[in-house]
């Protein structure tokens, strides 16, 4: 992902998106308890394969594991394979993984995350690490881990009134590295999401709304309201931040403006019309990066994954899903 705009507005409370009393009163605590220990284990298992960089054995083996886990939890799984071109002309063997809970239901919610790893730790404070791959415990594995735990809970509860499509986007993090002389206009990122949004797994695919989970396991993370999410899907931002408040995680979901992030939700919004938001960590006071101290560094490992963060995000999404009628 790429942060394309950072401004004073990020730190100013967004008065227009404050929830009304009616919105808050309309939502009560709902859904099963999200198991952060289970999500943490899913995150660790992905990392055990090694960095899931494009065209690598670790990538392919992890993909097989993700497919098997969603199938284990009763989802119907499709794999959308495509040869995509990286910024440098490299052919990327991409595999978007789509797991559908209750595919027979016409009313659907889209949950998504990317599952590939950044091939270069180009934001590492040590320049000798810039061409090393990133383990991507947070920036990759955490979002998939939360989705897998939700899939496990849905199979167990089996009481959700809507269908859910879990989409694991590939080739998100092959964007132009900072050490390259190439001009970065954002098009080199989110390649799998770009492809899926133009070639959905089901012709004419529709969903009530979508939620992208990106970097949702980092220690000290907070989730501000991302700019493009507010632009394309303000009602969904309101819904999710209300759910966070009801679930007891208002402190991690402040009612403040974040940056404008080029991420997987961007092509989904532009090409499908499905109002989709990005739950993405924002660290306004971090000198290393507003995405946090481990972003695109060799330190993005399980040592820096916080179960409390996974719990807050996972329980918030559960609250959203089980509040849908």
Please describe what each predicted stretch is:
Residues 10-13:
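C-terminal motif of bacterial Sec signal peptides marking the signal peptidase cleavage site
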Residues 16-62, 73, 287-304:
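N-terminal capping segment at the start of a domain
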Residues 25-33, 48-57, 84-87, 129-141, ...:
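Second-shell loop/turn segments in exported
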Residues 38-45, 61, 65-72, 142-149, ...:
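Extracytoplasmic/secreted proteins, especially bacterial periplasmic and envelope-associated proteins
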Residues 44-104:
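A non-catalytic alpha/beta surface segment that caps or lines the substrate-entry region
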Residues 52-54, 83-86, 103-105, 115-119, ...:
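Solvent-exposed loop/turn segments at secondary-structure junctions
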Residues 81, 91, 209, 216-325:
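Active-site-adjacent substrate-binding region
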Residues 131-235, 260, 264:
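Acidic/histidine-rich catalytic neighborhood of metal-dependent amide-processing enzymes
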């Amino acid at each position: 992902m790429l942060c394309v705009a950072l401004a004073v507005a990020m730190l100013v409370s967004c008065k227009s998106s404050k929830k009304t009393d009616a919105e808050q009163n309309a939502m009560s605590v709902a859904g099963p308890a999200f198991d952060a220990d289970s999500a943490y284990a899913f995150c660790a298992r992905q990392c055990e394969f090694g960095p899931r960089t494009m065209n690598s054995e670790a990538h392919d083996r992890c993909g097989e594991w993700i497919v098997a886990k969603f199938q284990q939890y009763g989802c119907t799984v499709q794999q959308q394979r495509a040869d995509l071109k990286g910024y440098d002309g490299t052919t990327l063997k991409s595999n978007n993984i789509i797991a559908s809970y209750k595919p027979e239901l016409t009313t659907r919610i889209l949950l998504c995350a990317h599952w590939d790893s950044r091939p270069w730790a180009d934001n590492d404070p040590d320049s000798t690490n810039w061409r090393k791959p990133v383990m991507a415990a947070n920036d990759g594995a955490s979002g998939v881990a939360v989705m897998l735990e939700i899939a496990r809970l849905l199979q167990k509860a089996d009481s959700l009134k809507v269908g859910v499509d879990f989409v694991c986007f590939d080739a998100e993090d092959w964007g132009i590295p900072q050490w390259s002389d190439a001009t970065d206009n954002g098009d080199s990122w989110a390649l799998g999401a770009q492809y899926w949004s133009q070639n959905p797994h089901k012709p004419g695919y529709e969903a009530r709304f979508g939620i992208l989970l990106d970097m949702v396991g980092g220690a000290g993370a907070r989730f501000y309201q991302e700019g493009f999410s507010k632009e394309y899907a303000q009602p969904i931002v309101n819904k999710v931040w209300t759910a966070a408040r009801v679930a007891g995680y208002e402190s991690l979901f402040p009612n403040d403006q974040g940056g404008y992030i080029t991420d997987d939700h961007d092509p989904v919004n532009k090409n499908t019309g499905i109002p989709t938001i990005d739950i993405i960590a924002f660290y306004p006071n971090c000198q290393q990066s507003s995405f946090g101290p481990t972003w695109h560094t060799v330190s993005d490992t399980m040592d820096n994954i916080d179960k409390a963060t996974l719990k807050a995000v996972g329980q918030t999404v559960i609250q959203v899903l089980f509040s849908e009628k």
